[in-house]
Amino acid sequence: MNPQANDRKEFQGDCSATGDLTAKHDSAGGNGGGGARYKLMSPAKLPISRSTDITIPPGLSPTSFLESPVFISNIKPEPSPTTGSLFKPRPVHISASSSSYTGRGFHQNTFTEQKSSEFEFRPPASNMVYAELGKIRSEPPVHFQGQGHGSSHSPSSISDAAGSSSELSRPTPPCQMTPTSSDIPAGSDQEESIQTSQNDSRGSTPSILADDGYNWRKYGQKHVKGSEFPRSYYKCTHPNCEVKKLFERSHDGQITDIIYKGTHDHPKPQPGRRNSGGMAAQEERLDKYPSSTGRDEKGSGVYNLSNPNEQTGNPEVPPISASDDGGEAAASNRNKDEPDDDDPFSKRRRMEGAMEITPLVKPIREPRVVVQTLSEVDILDDGYRWRKYGQKVVRGNPNPRSYYKCTAHGCPVRKHVERASHDPKAVITTYEGKHDHDVPTSKSSSNHEIQPRFRPDETDTISLNLGVGISSDGPNHASNEHQHQNQQLVNQTHPNGVNFRFVHASPMSSYYASLNSGMNQYGQRETKNETQNGDISSLNNSSYPYPPNMGRVQSGP
């Protein structure tokens, strides 16, 4: 029997009952070597017919092309997308004698019949669908060439025939979709997509690995000598915590080095009260390292597995309370501290990705006491000693405000003094705190009131000596001497025998003395009396408190 006629007869029958077409061809070959010749031929050297018509013999259904073993694709399974690699299916070109056939298809038992020692991602065969079957229309037509005539059929016929099959119309969840060779770029594009997918899988891990449970605030970033990547500096946001963290991040998002300085003296914050850094970190990572598989509008199985939130159309947005380690969080956030007008301790942190306002813990304040007085000087004497440590102009008052601190050791009292904006003569003094010590006994350096050193009392004894002498005896002796001196002045006559009235021709120095608690204090005062009549009552009563007893002194015969 002619081998070529035998091949045509076998192909016209049921292809599913004939077994392996390759084995039949080897058993029917003329010289026994034709069956192995196609294995040595390059796919580019296979003859391809350019015929545009197709002839299907009677008794052959178009759906049998999909079920025939001829359409088995030599898919070499490789590690699944979970390990960072993709499938690389390669179609097998089979030629029989003078005929050649190039096709692509899937069988239900394709993956179950494959034997591999590597890890494979195999979805259930019953739920597997022929992905992207509609793309066959855009591919070159599949040709079949016989002995005496050539016949070809376009992919549209197979697609239309496959559309009537109930097996192909079965809905399948997207997560079980298997990528085909048309979904994966060829050549360098395929390698690029594999490498980018691996970067995406690694890019999502740094924020998780660097999460230590604390809240961090970024305060700087710079390039350090000897480091390949920039170094970011973070500080713990807990009040009075001095722990700092610095780490270096590579260009692909990998955290290469993390250094902690100090030890936390507080427990980790609750998850509900942590800063929202995870969302900012994810947004920054997506902006800096976009996934190349995201450019495929139709999507593939690998993209759906690595990015499940993009497949469903509902982007996964972390809650506001969710947090990252703060290192990744603060890379795109800039915390802005806004001090209050009169409250230097209260600060608000405004996050770009969240509207959470976290007030810092304020120290306990002492009560304030405000005193307003009218004075020409700014500082009033309150008995305490103060040291000035600052001055500034506050908003709403053009007059400067001076800040003082009590000089006593350990005293927390402070005050600030300023003149009122509505009244320049009014001095406003604000005290903060309470003194924990007594008022100093010595005179304050800020005392501007001049007190008299000596205040004579009306009951004190005063001796008017009139320049003759100073008495240090008791009050009786001083009084007797005073009367004696007055008597001498009255009886005094002029050398020429002319009587005179009690007149002081020249200023005289008078001394006064007072006996106070056994101590004699002396003073000197210059007095002038140029009147003709000597009136003793004109003397200063403060230095001579006794009432005059001689009246007007006159001299005469």
From Swiss-Prot:
Location(s), subcellular: Nucleus
GO MF annotation list: DNA-binding transcription factor activity; metal ion binding; transcription cis-regulatory region binding
Keyword terms of this UniProt record: DNA-binding, Metal-binding, Nucleus, Repeat, Transcription, Transcription regulation, Zinc
Region Disordered, annotated ranges: 1-36, 76-215, 257-348, 433-486, 520-557
Main location: nucleus
A Pfam family: WRKY
UniProt feature, compositional bias: Polar residues: 95-114, 193-207, 303-314, 520-536
One GO cellular component term noted in the UniProt record for this chain: nucleus
Coiled coil: none
GO biological process per UniProt: positive regulation of DNA-templated transcription; response to 1-aminocyclopropane-1-carboxylic acid; response to wounding
Low complexity: compositionally biased ranges: 151-169, 321-332
Residues where Zn(2+) binds: 236, 241, 264, 266, 406, 411, 435, 437
Domain of life: Eukaryota
Biased composition (Basic and acidic residues): 1-12, 282-299
SUPFAM superfamilies, alphabetized: WRKY DNA-binding domain (SSF118290)
Residue ranges: DNA binding: 205-269, 375-440
Function: Transcription factor. Interacts specifically with the W box (5'-(T)TGAC[CT]-3'), a frequently occurring elicitor-responsive cis-acting element.
UniProt family annotation: Belongs to the WRKY group I family.
Protein name according to UniProt: Probable WRKY transcription factor 20
Organism: Arabidopsis thaliana (Mouse-ear cress)
Lineage, top ranks: Eukaryota, Viridiplantae, Streptophyta, Embryophyta, Tracheophyta
Gene: WRKY20
